[in-house]
Amino acid sequence: MKKHFEKEIDSRRTFAIISHPDAGKTTITEKLLLFGGAIQQAGEVRARKAARHATSDWMEMEKQRGISVTSSVMKFTYRDYEINLLDTPGHNDFSEDTYRTLTAVDSVLMVIDSVKGVESQTKKLLEVCRLRHTPIMTFINKLDREGREPLDLLDDIESTLNIQCAPMTWPVGMGKRFRGTYHLYSKELTFFDPEADRGTGQTITVKGLDDPLLDELLGSQVEELRNDVELLEGAAHPFEQEAYLAGLQTPVFFGSAINTFGVQQLLDTFIEHAPPPQPRETETREVFPYEEAFSGFTFKIQANMDPAHRDRIAFFRICSGKFTRGMKVRHIRLGREVQIANATIFMAQDRTNVDEAYPGDIIGIHNHGTIKIGDTFTQGEDLKYTGIPNFAPEHFRKVRLLDPMKSKALEKGLVQLAEEGTTQVFRPLMGSDWIVGAVGLLQFDVVMHRLEHEYKVKATYEPVSYVTARWVTGEKKKMDEFEKKEAMSLYRDGEGNLAYLAGSQWRLDNTMENWKDIQFHATREHS
């Protein structure tokens, strides 16, 4: 029994893909699902104007804009491994949702556009991985286009992201001259053939770079490959498993996701080298996946995944023990026992009921408003998983309702959307206006769109003169005094926490100076 339990855990690989918008993240997601047999045909994203939309972009607004605005989870099996792939929003503005998704994975795949190199969003996301020492594997995409020199790209990754690169494959040419890749460790040459099934022509094993067979196969391009690899041997780092697992080194693959080329090499290396479920920190101790008692945490709430059901799903990462359908668990924040009768697993839009699940798995728990982001569930022990933050918003808008009869629906919509963590809502201590706060501007459009389509509420925004927010705490007597004096700038967020909204950085600094006994917080752990 124990052996089976451990085997199940060891076969799990839970990871997310990070990239800058348009680097090819959705495409590579689909190709991975193709190899896992989870989809039959890649819903080519650029054909999204046709009837089929990329499998992982399922919300109406994403379909219209062609960007992933919500993280979704996809599970598939490949070579006896159970793979949980968390898709993250590729758009600049969704850093908060992406950040929380990165708390639920054990490793990350970074996709880089060979034409553009490292871009701002990738840099931001990598800093988050760095905080958690998350292992990172890299796929340099779009080799079928004229891009930057491969050595130049490695240098860009190393200097910009401050991480060692260990190339695993090496491209032969690029753009119109792209012939394929040479595997530096298995000594295999794989040919690129856009007409062939999955973009991959034959793979030929050679006896190293001096093999005369290479001259026959590559003609004039063989010297270029030999020179590159010779340079690499002096300049690049050999792959070291320990350095990769510590987040200090990234193995690098080259390919063309749109042509499915290089994706299988990446996947084969990934399942063998990426870590299985890892131990997790709680406020009191470290929890190990092999512990028998079940535990885990919610990292995301998604409303209305199925318009027919008007439902809310809590995305839950299992950290220890085994989940079985109908089991009773303790909801730590509420201090009460609940039964999880109908948990689901995801394949983007498709959901199936789950009978059992193991550490590393992401399950969906139906939620009628009682589960919040960051909630811990256990089989009794009083644990609280840490590191799932809310960020202080940087942009604010006042919501003006167009139909006064809809104020209840507006409140319901705003509170539910805030629970998902996409935006934050604030109600003033004095007055009744709703203020929406967001980390990125695109989130305002998402809120309006979803209010109208999912809650049937028509509203508009009005500008407000706030630039930043801080959650405030302190001892009761001081807080009472602070509330009285600063009432015009004080708001309660969706969870009832007190927040101070400032019209300028100077105003915030000044208030903090005047109220030294009050603590001002730029982030807040989900309570």
UniProtKB/Swiss-Prot annotation:
Keyword Cell wall biogenesis/degradation: no
Originating gene: prfC
Record domain tr-type G: where: 10-278
Keywords: Cytoplasm, GTP-binding, Nucleotide-binding, Protein biosynthesis
Chain coiled-coil ranges: none
Sequence similarity: Belongs to the TRAFAC class translation factor GTPase superfamily. Classic translation factor GTPase family. PrfC subfamily.
Protein name: Peptide chain release factor 3
Location(s), subcellular: Cytoplasm
Entry keyword Zinc: no
Residues engaged in binding GTP: 19-26, 87-91, 141-144
Biological process terms in GO annotation: regulation of translational termination
CC per GO annotation: cytosol
NCBIfam families recorded: prfC, PRK00741.1, small_GTP
Domain of life: Bacteria
Function: Increases the formation of ribosomal termination complexes and stimulates activities of RF-1 and RF-2. It binds guanine nucleotides and has strong preference for UGA stop codons. It may interact directly with the ribosome. The stimulation of RF-1 and RF-2 is significantly reduced by GTP and GDP, but not by GMP.
Biological source species: Geotalea daltonii (strain DSM 22248 / JCM 15807 / FRC-32) (Geobacter daltonii)
GO molecular function (one): GTPase activity
